[in-house]
Every structure is written in C-alpha cells, then in structure tokens.
C-alpha cells in the first residue's frame, strides 16, 4: 500500500512506500488518495521520490495521460517545473506532460515552466513548438527572461541557424517585449562567432557602442576566443588594441584574454610561449588566467613547466589562491614528486588555507605508491588534527592502497576508524580486507570485519 500525503504548510506532495516496492509504485498509483492527515511529516526525499515516479511514467509509458489522470495528483507550479527539468532530455515528453498539466483546471502555469520547456525545445531544434510556447507566454502577459532569450539565440547559432538568431535579436523589443541588453548582444555575438562571421560580430560591437552600451569582459572574450579558434591571433590583438584606443578598455587585460582564447582553441604551445614572454618582461597573468593555464598544461603532462611557472609567478608578485594548489598538488603527487607536493602544501598553509581532503589525499596516495606507508600513515594522522576531517573517498583510497601494498591489518584498522566517524565503507573495501586477512591467516580479525559489515548493512 502507498500513501500520498500533503505537506501541512505548502503545496508539496510526497509518496511514502509502505509495503510495495518502488518498482510497483506506478501500478498502485491509481488507488491513491491525497490525505490531509498531519500525524506524520513526510520528508523532502519523499517529495522527490514522487517526482521521480511521475518522470518514469512520462518517459516510459506510451499513453502517460491515462496513468497521470489515475494518480489524481494536485498539480502545482513547482511540481510541473521539476518534472519538466527532469525530462528536458526528451522535449517531446516534456511538451506532452506540460499539455497534460495545462488541462488540469487547478493549475495555472507561470513563466518558470514556460521558459524551462522553451529551452528544452530550443536545445532539440523543435523551433516551431518553441515559438508556440513563447506565443502562449505573450498571450498570457508573461515576461520572458533575458536568460531564456540568450539561451535561444545561442542555440540558433550553435545549430548553424544564424539568420534566425539575427531575426530574433532584431525582433526582441517588438515581438517579445524584451530589451536588447549587453547579455543579449553577447549571445548574438556568440552565435555569429560559432559560424565564423567575424565581420558581422565586429559590426555588432560597433552597433552596441552606438547604442550606448559598454562591452563587458564576456564581450571581449567571445570575440577573442572566436578569432583564436580560427587561428586569427593578429585580428584578435588588433581588435583589443582598437578598443583600447577608443577608450573601451576590457575589464581584463588583453594578454589574459588572448591566453584564454588560445587555451580554449587548443593552442597550448602558443599560450605557453605568450606566458613565457610575459614573465620574462616582468609581467604575470591574472590569477584566473593563471589557474586555467596550469590546469591545461598539467593535463597535458608537463607538470615541471607548471611548477617552474608557479615559482616564477610568485616571485613576480602573483598571489595564488586555493584553486592553484588544488591543481598543482595532485599533479606533482601523481608523478611521484612527494617533496615538491609537501612544499606546495606548506605554502598553502602559510597562505592561510586549511588543507582540504582533496589537497592531502593525493600526497598520501603518492606516498603509498612509492612504498612509503609508514610516512603516509603518520602524515594522515597529522592531517586529521591540523586539516579538514577526512571524508569517505579519502578513507576508501587509503584502504585500497593498503590492500594493494599487502597492509591488510592497517586497512582493517582504517575500516573500523571510518565506521567510528559515521562513514559507511563500500562493499569492495570489506571484501578486499576480509579476503586479505584470511589469506594472511588472520581469521579472527577477518571474522570481526565481517561482523562489522553485517551490523552496518543488516545483512
């Protein structure tokens, strides 16, 4: 039996499975009645379980309307929005559910649901249905947000329909009653750059300036990224120089925009060369560009270059942040440079950051890989006191590394310690530890670990 209960103070509904399994929920929905009892308080998880059941009906059933009608669910704005968002990967399912919801006399759609559906239809190239939804919004005097408008324009450009993007942009004030803001200009600029119409993009910026709007960082970044992706570095530099001469200096320095543009276009060597020239001249990128650069370079395997650039930038006065260390410490630990990882961690602490598990876990893993288990255990003990508490992934990693190194007694100790902290180990950890202990002749300890698993899982 299933009970459908209403939240006492709002419009949320939840499904509480009592005896039936989750898989049989749909079959039993037709016998549900909304109850007004307030003797128990359903949880937020129950509410989302109800949404999940409705989503499954919409996705899987050939005629979902009949099943939805049999549920006799109170249809609310938030409920419809969440179902639309969950079914956004299938615009036909979303549209069908929305049409069913609109047929409910107690439901009055808001712009939130309309816009979610319009974005889903636009992303799946269902432009005719999308325009019908937008017309319904206008007929109901519902405003279309700038975010939705920008999304549709960019989707047109992404799919190569730049003429429709320009038409929508030009008709924004009259057709949809929206303003041509900087964000809307940026979206059309993005659409033009997607199809390599750089002359049109540059003309759009000139029009933007004539209208009295000031380009922001994204305006510059879109055009620079587009030019860089087409291999037009010279044009990107000339554009930035011209905008500076006109008095429209970008919020970020031109060289930073060029570096990010090269990275986004995949020209890693050119970006490295530009940064090297900057540092030799005594200049450094801003911290955001620097972090993007070292992340891209470290992924390519050139960790030594990242370390060298880090120390050079620090000498030139760059104030690194926690994101810098989140990139560098795992990278140097992965290639076995444990001493360098410790130096970076000490610098992180001196900068006032309390180490997160994502910072010290890679060092522990690197030490275990090098066979430095005693040092790793000692360092882990220090981190439990001086840093943020270890989480489940850290313990799982440490237990796994102990198992690979044959340290099954230590792995068992960390398994018990993990449970004492309220963290539930995964089944693989239990299996690995018990098998290792049995193979090593420690059957009593293996039995205690098995009993611990039974207590935790109730199996």
Curated annotation (Swiss-Prot):
PROSITE patterns: PPR (PS51375)
Pfam families in alphabetical order: PPR, PPR_1, PPR_2
Entry's Gene Ontology BP terms: RNA splicing
Keyword Mitochondrion: yes
Any one GO cellular component localisation term in the record: mitochondrion
Compartments reported by the entry: Mitochondrion
Boundaries of the annotated transit peptide in chain numbering: 1-7
Highest taxon above the source species: Eukaryota
PPR repeat spans: 110-144, 145-175, 181-215, 216-250, 251-285, 286-320, 321-355, 356-390, 391-425
Keywords: Mitochondrion, Repeat, Transit peptide
Primary location class: mitochondrion
Transit peptide as UniProt keyword: yes
UniProt record similarity statement: Belongs to the PPR family. P subfamily.
PANTHER family: OS01G0970900 PROTEIN, PENTACOTRIPEPTIDE-REPEAT REGION OF PRORP DOMAIN-CONTAINING PROTEIN
This protein's name: Pentatricopeptide repeat-containing protein At5g18390, mitochondrial
Lineage, uppermost ranks: Eukaryota, Viridiplantae, Streptophyta, Embryophyta, Tracheophyta
